[in-house]
Amino acid sequence: MKKIGMIGVGNMGGAILRGMIASGYVAAEDVMACLHSEEKRQALAAEIPGLTCTTDAKALAQECRMIVLAVKPQVLGELLDSIKGEINDRALVSIAAGWTMDMLTSKVAGTTATLLRVMPNTPALVGAGMTAICRQATLSAADLAYAQGIFDAIGETAVIDEKLFDGFIAVSGSSPAYIFMLIEAMADAAVREGIRRPDAVKMAAQAVLGSAKMVLETGKHPGQLKDEVCSPAGTTIEAVAMLEKRGFRAAVQDAMAVCAEKSRQMSK
């Protein structure tokens, strides 16, 4: 029996698959992937030696102990119906947005499958993701730890209560879009000052990357790090004062609030 099965190898599924193999967390020989076309199956098998590839989801469910469901939300229900007879004693890991634990539990009712709901974000595509994990109460500690290791291979993970998922989506799932807007705005301003566009984008992106790294590695409060950049009567405090005047903090918090509320509505 294979250790891990992956149904769906699109952008996110592919990042998870390649990340866990490239990191050495699991050997390609211990993984099976299911793709929707023979052409894609052949291409992936050629790309990753030792990986077993199929177009038959039922066959994968029969062969794999833990199954990552990386298909689009609108087809997950049909997929679960099709493999329901094969998932007894399997641990299912869903990354489908909007599918709550109650919805997943209802779909696998009558089986002994156990469940995890997982929410990665797009920086996982470059190995710098942040993934939230919610476990079903009946899931074993060993299965939780093993699943967490899969997503640790593409960034960082946090095991949280499902009631916090809407907040997680606001602060991490959707937030790359806010940060991209910030980088774009910073680059535009730099171009106005005469800096070439490619250089401006690189400078802005590196500033965000370096600042995030300082928060994570120094352990200092972001406010303290901000204060350390602001010299008395200097350039930075002028910029900070303008951001405060324009309601920068409130805009970010309001954006996150509507994001979380939209997530709650979508899960009903």
What annotation goes with each model-predicted range?
Residues M1-T55, Q62, V191-E193:
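NAD(P)+-binding Rossmann beta1-loop-alpha1 motif at the extreme N-terminus of oxidoreductases
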Residues M103, K107-T114, M130-G167, F180-E217:
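Internal alpha-helical scaffold of NAD(P)-dependent oxidoreductase catalytic cores
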Residues A205-K268:
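NAD(P)-dependent Rossmann-like dehydrogenase/reductase catalytic/cofactor-binding core
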